[in-house]
Structures are given as C-alpha cells and as structure tokens.
Regions:
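Short, glycine-rich, amphipathic interfacial segments at transmembrane boundaries or analogous
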Residues: 176-223, 281-298
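C-terminal terminal-structure detector
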Residues: 2, 273-333
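STAS-typified acidic loop motif
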Residues: 6-37, 56
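A hydrophobic, helix-centered structural microdomain
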Residues: 134-202, 317-333
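Short, non-transmembrane cytosolic segments of multipass membrane proteins
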Residues: 86-119
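Short, glycine-/small-residue-enriched flexible loop/hinge segments at domain edges that mediate gating
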Residues: 40-63
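Glycine-rich flexible loop motifs, especially short His-Gly-Gly/GGXG/HXGH segments used as catalytic or interaction
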Residues: 112-149, 174, 289-311
C-alpha cells in the first residue's frame, strides 16, 4: 500500500515502511534546505527505515547547495543505520555526481531511461549545470590561461632563489600540496611553495584557531618558518597556484578554496560559495584577508563576488590585489 505524508516539505510516499522522497526539477539552495528538512523529519520518526528512496526522475538541475544537502543527509542516514538509495537519476545529475566523485559513494539504483554510459561519458561536460555565469565564460577562461602562463613564467624565474631559501631555512620539500574543494565541491590538489615546517598538517590540531566558524587562522602560527612568513607577506608562496589555474581547477579570481574539513562543517546555504571556481584572489583577498576572522564574513564576501561578477569586476579585483601586495598591512590567507 502506498500512502502520502502531506506535512513533509517534499512529497513523500510510503511503500510499506520504505519512504520515497520525490525531488523537484531544480535542487538549488531553497529546495536543498527543504530537502534536508524533509529527511530530518523522516529520521526523527519513532522508526528509522532501513532505506530511503530518493526519486530524481524530475530533477534536471543540481548545484552545490543540492550536493551539500545530499551529503548531509547521507551522513545522517549512515549514523542512523539507514541508507539513501537514488532512483531514476537523469544524465544531467549523474554528470554532477561523476564530477564530484559522489557516484563512488552513493547507492544509485538505476540510470534514467534511455541513458547509456557511453552517451553520458561523451556529453557530460555539456550536461554539467551552469551554476554561475562565470563558470561557462570563455573570455574569463582565456584570461585565466594567459594570466597563468605569465604567472608560471614569473614562477620559473623566481623558483631557484625561493627553493634555496626554503631549503636553507627548513630542509624538506620545496612545494606543499593540499586537498581543497573546488567548483561544486570537487576535490583537487592545490600547490604552494612550502611556508611551514614539514609536519605542519600533523601539528594543526595543536594550534589554537583564532577564527570563528569553518575557517582556520592563527596570527602567530608557530608552524610557519622564517622564510615562510616573508613569502606569505608577499604572497610568493602562492605562485605555484598558477598551475592550478592553467589546469582549470582554479581561476585567477574567485572564492577562497576551502579544505574538505571546513566544508564538512557547512550548513546547506553555505555551499553556495562553491557555485563558482575558487580563485587565487577575490573579495576576501582585497578586503583584509588576515583580518577576516568570522566565517560569516567569508560567506558574505564570496556571495558579494558572485552577485557582482563581471569580466570588468574580475579585472578590478586583480588590480586591487596588486595594490594590496604592496600594502604593509596585508597578510596571509
């Protein structure tokens, strides 16, 4: 017997004790919040179902907020001993799952009718959602490529003296790689010149966080080397990120690239900042990056960038960044 619960945020039907949540055509921030609320209502019941069916038959658009709600619900389901089963997922949504590697961890029952893996593979780039105009701007991408090539040329010139300074000050690797979250939450490896001691990541838990929310900051972080402080003051440590820009993982201008542990603490609306590519610079960089200590301020600046974005706005932020680099009050990200 199939029954319907009218009080749910989304339409929920039951077949026996197994609920099916019917998702809407679009799964962006407002719908994503409602999606999370709907699943919370199911999980707060007296009996936790062994599985929850998520019917994606109507859904053709999902952005980073939708991904955030799905990830959040998946974690709660596992904590409750339940499982989310995705049914009738359209190729557009499957392309997003493939981009973010969620197709590796989600239980997907079956593809949408008439969708085959070969077709999806060849057209997945065209099926990815346009979460923000900057994502599909070929002019912005051209500026990124030209800027990255120029930046890598400068990096090549400065590489030897920087490498020698790093090695003399604190022997170890020249480069530091760290997993960050890019567009739609996709993981990528960001590169910098190493500005901290070799075992910096292992020592992070021992350092006091002077910021509030899902960011980490400490003005006197003891892990930073002497040469590292100079590089951070001048942003020389970030020169290798031009490689990330050239690969398309980052942009010259965008939002601050968060770490996975930061993203794990996001509420659904905060995932909106992942609707654009992360950038080497952005609003947070030109508005006193070292003085931004509240995560809500980071969100505000990132959303301001998304709302005001244009090619001229990007160029304006690039020139502002150059000015900030010569400001003695600038600081490390």
């Amino acid at each position: 017997m199939v029954s319907q619960t009218p009080e749910a945020e989304f339409r929920v039907t039951y077949k026996g004790e197994i609920p099916s949540v019917h998702l809407p055509v679009r799964l962006s921030v407002l719908e994503a919040v409602a999606f999370k609320t709907t699943c919370q209502q199911i999980f707060s019941g007296t009996t936790i179902p062994s599985e929850i069916i998520l019917d994606f038959n109507q859904t053709t658009f999902i952005d980073s907020s939708g991904i955030g709600a799905l990830v959040s619900n998946m974690k709660v389901a596992r904590q409750k001993g339940s499982n989310l089963v995705l049914r009738r997922v359209n190729p557009q949504v499957m392309a997003v799952f493939a981009l973010t590697s969620l197709d590796q961890v989600l239980t997907i029952e079956q593809p949408a009718p008439n969708a085959n893996s070969t077709e999806t593979h060849h057209s997945k780039d065209h099926q990815l959602p346009i979460t923000h105009p900057s994502v599909r701007s070929w002019v912005k991408r051209l500026i990124d490529i030209v800027g990255a090539l120029v930046g890598l040329g400068i990096t090549g010139i400065l590489f030897l003296p920087i490498a020698i300074a790093i090695t003399i000050d604190n022997p170890g690797p020249i480069f530091f790689g760290q997993t960050r979250c890019g567009w739609m939450g996709k993981h990528f490896r960001i590169w910098k010149f190493r500005s901290m001691c070799v075992n910096a990541e292992a020592l992070k838990s021992q350092i006091k966080n002077q910021a509030s929310g899902a960011i980490f900051k400490n003005d006197n972080d003891p892990r930073i080397t002497r040469v590292g402080r100079i590089m951070r003051k001048t942003s020389l440590d970030e020169l290798p990120q031009f490689w990330n820009v050239l690969k398309g993982e980052m942009s010259l201008v965008g939002t601050r690239p968060p770490t996975p542990d930061e993203v794990e603490r996001y509420e659904v609306p905060q995932w909106q900042r992942l609707d654009v590519k992360p950038g080497m610079t952005g609003e947070w960089q030109v508005n006193g990056r070292s003085s931004v200590r509240d995560f809500e301020d980071v969100i505000r600046l990132d959303l301001k960038y998304q709302q005001n974005w244009s090619l001229m706005y990007d160029l304006k932020l690039i020139f502002k960044t150059i000015a900030v680099l010569f400001n003695k009050n600038s600081g490390a990200v």
